Swiss-Prot record:
One GO CC annotation: cytoplasm
The keyword Metal-binding appears for this protein: no
Transmembrane region(s): 97-117, 134-154, 165-185, 190-210, 226-246, 253-273, 280-300
Origin organism lineage: Eukaryota, Fungi, Dikarya, Ascomycota, Taphrinomycotina
Basic and acidic residues bias (residue ranges): 11-29
InterPro entries from the UniProt entry: WTF
Single Gene Ontology BP annotation: meiotic drive
Source organism: Schizosaccharomyces kambucha (Fission yeast)
Protein name: Meiotic driver wtf30
Length: 350
């Protein structure tokens, strides 16, 4: 019986025909395969001529290597049963009994805490209970027990729902905070000016009430008005100021506070050494001046970093320029006085 070869080309044959450079050096170039008459077999297919499957690996001893080192390991019954048990890929993710019990009890506890606190505040916890009160208490306990059993039975469902709700809420709040912070960052300069003006108005109203006697405050509080204003301005404007400049803001506020403290110490120390003290009007003037000066310096330092550091140099330059102008004026007057009388007569005739 003749062997029939059907015109079928495998993917391996197609790959070998495409790769012209892959030639076996021992057997030479690949012969052409004529699938119609079957006279030429596929390349390197001498094993297909063998009818006995045992003789298929005679020409190629490496085809069926029975070396023990390459044989697969012998899997015992324990390993096979272990593989069968974990073949589905499912693991036991159920929570322990006590944890489920505790988490299911937390909502009941949170629900009862306000009621217990309210009854304790009213001094009506288990006091003067009549029939109706005990019936209500029993119904409440039964309702709590049913809710607890429901939470324990449907633990997986409601915990997943709560976790998803918390996740969605957190993402939404984060987006809202991001949008608000970006909006405030874009208008931070205008917001700082508005906040400063509003706080200035509030302090002016406070001073008016103190002056009229409707509000009695200690002098120490009036002295510290400048510090309070700076701190409140920092707290409110910290929303408008980017977080990465918060350290710089604290540094500028510390400089302003030190400057204000120095002025207060110098003024009060001078008055104390002279045996005098500020009257009520003097305290108001001092507090108002320190308040306005502190806020103006703080805003200038925030808008123009290094203003306080450059202030002594600017003051020295200003004083030097002023003195230089006076010196030039005096020198010019002296030069005019040194002109000879003959030259003055010639100039007058001309």
């Amino acid at each position: 019986m003749k062997n029939k070869y059907y015109p079928l080309r495998s993917s391996i044959d197609e790959l070998s025909t495409k790769n012209d450079n892959e030639i076996d050096l021992e057997k030479g170039p690949l012969p052409e395969y004529n699938s119609e008459d079957g006279s030429t077999l596929p390349p390197y297919s001498e094993n297909l001529k063998l009818k006995d499957p045992k003789q298929m690996g005679a020409n190629n001893p490496n085809l069926f290597n029975t070396d023990e080192s390459t044989t697969p390991p012998d899997y015992g019954e324990d390993s096979l049963s272990h593989r069968e048990n974990h073949s589905s890929g499912t693991t036991d993710n159920s929570s322990p009994f006590l944890i489920k019990l505790l988490i299911s009890f937390i909502p009941i506890f949170v629900l009862n805490v306000p009621a217990v606190c309210y009854l304790t505040y009213k001094d009506a916890l288990f006091k003067d209970y009549g029939k109706d009160e005990w019936v209500y208490f029993g119904m409440w306990c039964a309702s709590c027990l049913m809710i607890f059993i429901s939470l324990w039975c449907f633990y997986e469902t409601w915990t997943q729902a709560v976790a998803q709700c918390v996740k969605v809420t957190a993402i939404s709040l984060a987006k809202c905070v991001k949008v608000i912070s970006i909006g405030l960052f874009n208008i931070r300069r205008e917001m700082m000016i508005i906040i400063w003006i509003l706080w200035l108005i509030i302090c002016c109203i406070l001073f008016v009430y103190i002056k009229s006697g409707d509000l009695n405050l200690n002098k120490a509080l009036i002295y510290s008005t400048c510090t309070i204003s700076a701190v409140l301005l920092l707290i409110v404007s910290s929303v408008c100021i980017p977080f990465w400049t918060f350290e710089r803001t604290l540094a500028k506020l510390a400089k302003v506070f030190l400057l204000q403290s120095g002025i207060v110490l110098v003024l009060n120390g001078t008055m104390f050494l002279r045996g005098k003290h500020f009257e009520w009007t003097g305290c108001e003037i001092e507090a108002s001046v320190l308040f306005i000066m502190g806020n103006v310096l703080f805003l200038c330092e925030m808008e123009c970093p290094g203003a306080l550091r450059r202030m002594p140099k600017s003051i020295r330059n200003g004083i030097a320029s002023f003195l230089g102008g006076i010196a030039n004026a005096i020198r010019g007057a002296n030069d005019n006085n040194d002109i000879p009388l003959g030259e003055m007569d010639v100039e007058s005739e001309v």
